Amino acid sequence: MRVILAPMQGVLDPFVRQLLTQVNQYDLCVSEFVRVVDQLLPTKVFYRLCPELYQQGLTASGTPVRVQLLGQHPQWLAENAQRAIELGSHGIDLNCGCPSKTVNGSNGGASLLKQPELIYHATKALRAAVPKALPVSVKVRLGWDNSEQAFEIADAVQQGGATEITIHGRTKMDGYRADRINWAKINDVRQRLSIPVIANGEIWDWQSGQACLAETGCQDLMIGRGALNIPNLSQVVKFNQAKMPWAEVLILLHQYAHTENQFDTGFYHVARIKQWLGYLKKAYPQADALFQLIKTCHDGQALRMKIDGVMN
């Protein structure tokens, strides 16, 4: 079984990837999306969103990273895919699942679910641009507002030549509502395809991971929000290990707090720590207490002083 760390825009930035891969055995990470419009992007854009490209596309602990592209113009997706591959990406992933209103408003992400033919052409262009030895993957949801087109969407991906497909078990309109997860539909789609299907959605622990594998019939899982709730989730899902003790979570947060300038992700660092604590408190009651302690911090120095105090 492979366990893949999902792309989460504005959340799983390069340094969080580094932290999580150093305490897990992820088989692959997918980067935050590189937005492609109507031009070949400069190399600095790829390096900013995926600095692992400086290290042969690997995190510090050796986990391969695959660049994800977002856009709706097959030609420009293909040209930017070639650039990402030249820089060292371990294949290319196409984003057809992001539910963000901003992204969808510019005809990217999940908006492509309404246009299976465009998904086909984009996938085909990527497959032609990427060397055959390297994978082209596509991440989708079950549909826009219902799952009636799920088969058509998946067929478009397969007919376009993708190596594998990741299916999030909800529609775009379902958002992240737990009661809307539909693993059974992933299984229906999987049985129709000959390419590998990676299941995604509502995987929080060993039990839900096993349930997802059983109901979808998939052999591989992609985890996103759960990886932030329990920082060693791949170990939990793969090996039924216990969740990481809070003391070890604190060490990760301490590392994060002291690397404010290591990567330029374009996001406000203090807010990112607070955001991560929002995820952590679902599994660790201590995270809420720490959030209350730092919630008035507005700069990195104040944040570090607070966290250093807790560590000591």
From Swiss-Prot:
Q: Where is this site: Interacts with tRNA?
A: 35, 95, 176, 272, 274, 279, 295
Q: What is this protein called?
A: tRNA-dihydrouridine(16) synthase
State the needed cofactors, names only.
FMN
- Active-site residues are 98 (proton donor)
What Pfam families does the record point to?
Dus
List ligand-binding residues for FMN. Answer: 7-9, 68, 139, 200-202, 224-225
Entry's SUPFAM superfamilies? FMN-linked oxidoreductases (SSF51395)
**E.C. numbers:** 1.3.1.-
Judging by the UniProt lineage, the source's domain of life is: Bacteria
Q: Which UniProt keywords apply?
A: Flavoprotein, FMN, NADP, Oxidoreductase, RNA-binding, tRNA processing, tRNA-binding
Membrane-crossing ranges are none
As one GO molecular function, the record gives: tRNA-dihydrouridine16 synthase activity
The catalysed reaction is: 5,6-dihydrouridine(16) in tRNA + NADP(+) = uridine(16) in tRNA + NADPH + H(+); 5,6-dihydrouridine(16) in tRNA + NAD(+) = uridine(16) in tRNA + NADH + H(+)
Give the originating organism: Pasteurella multocida (strain Pm70)
Keyword presence, Glycosyltransferase: no
